[in-house]
Curated annotation (Swiss-Prot):
The active site is at H82 (proton donor). The lineage of its organism: Archaea, Thermoproteota, Thermoprotei, Sulfolobales, Sulfolobaceae. The keyword Repeat does not apply. (2S)-2-hydroxy-3-oxobutyl phosphate binds at E79, T80, R122. One of its GO terms (molecular function) is 6,7-dimethyl-8-ribityllumazine synthase activity. It comes from Sulfolobus acidocaldarius (strain ATCC 33909 / DSM 639 / JCM 8929 / NBRC 15157 / NCIMB 11770). Coiled coil: none annotated. This is 6,7-dimethyl-8-ribityllumazine synthase. Belongs to the DMRL synthase family.
Length: 158
């Protein structure tokens, strides 16, 4: 994604402390990429685990000064299916909140079903993609909300 003036875009980041050897690096990459893109990260909130994100994300989405939320986490496969439950339920609730508030909540959560080594390999990709997706969605939602579709046709928003 090319660097543009995105100074009017304000993000919140919610990051899991579980697997913090991975998520701390994800946070560093996300903050660097947001700076590169010229967007403002208004707040970073750490939560115990990915499953705990929804309540904080909801509070951020209520705030007028937050345009979107980036979530960062790593759900590593264990001996049970716990990772599947955590990842699936977290993703579902985050999507529900995004739709409810009409603001992007991007999924920078690695997993389920990944090993620690696989998660490490995905740190940069997931972090940067989550920030880029938030920025793109915020810009496109803004354009969509400004268009008077009673007067315009064949509109393409990119």
């Amino acid at each position: 994604m090319e660097m543009q003036d995105q100074s009017k875009i304000n993000l919140g980041i919610v990051v899991s402390e579980f697997n913090y050897d991975i998520t701390s690096l994800m946070l560093q990459r996300a903050l660097s990429h947001a700076e590169f893109l010229g967007v403002t990260v208004k707040v970073v909130v750490k939560v115990p685990g990915s499953y705990d994100m929804a309540v904080i994300v909801k509070e951020l989405l209520k705030r007028d000064e937050i345009d979107g939320v980036v979530t960062l986490g790593a759900v590593i496969k264990g001996e049970t299916k716990h990772d599947e439950i955590v990842a699936t339920q977290t993703a579902r609730k985050l999507m529900d909140l995004s739709v409810e508030y009409g603001k992007p909540v991007t999924l920078g959560i690695i997993g389920h079903g990944v090993t620690h080594e696989q998660a490490v390999e995905r740190i940069e990709e997931y972090s940067m993609r989550a920030v880029e997706s938030a920025v793109k969605l915020i810009k496109r939602l803004k354009k969509l909300r400004e268009i008077d579709l009673t007067k315009e046709t064949n509109v393409s928003i990119e």
